[in-house]
């Protein structure tokens, strides 16, 4: 395989787990928020982080915190570039929310059952249900424990997006696909999934994304 790069649209101090998985999949990671750099990459990861500026989905702030508007702008610009150029995108935690907002969707600024999903002394774990005809089903089967560290959640879905994984207790959307574009997103954190608690690994998801990147390169 020729040298291929996957961009990670975040800060170097917060993306070490992501770069490790990108390297494990045989790609060169490039942590950048510059669309000029992303133009030379074959894939994009939108990583976890704080909450998205509510104005970007048409709302005032009524529960969002740890907002970095400048970062949001750069991440959404990175996503838009990939969208227009059909470059595969993987969104993780905040990243899935960026995908949704970037396609016109909205966010619960504080999910009604956030106590089930938010970070306490560490990630919480809960079961999920996976849609049978989705890309996740061959990787993880019909049910899968996932790790949660979020208090927000997807609300109205953006154009072309489809939910493929849910928390059965409260219908929180845990993963997305797109009807025609190479866009995938998960609300959980595959880069730090505890194999002892989840009984599986996040590596399968990263390997799937790697195959998507190769297919579109």
Predicted segments, located by residue:
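Catalytic histidine neighborhood in serine/cysteine hydrolases
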Residues: 181-185
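DNA-recognition element of transcription regulators
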Residues: 148
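N-terminal beta1-alpha1 cap of cysteine-dependent amidohydrolase-like domains
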Residues: 1-94, 100-102, 108, 112-124, ...
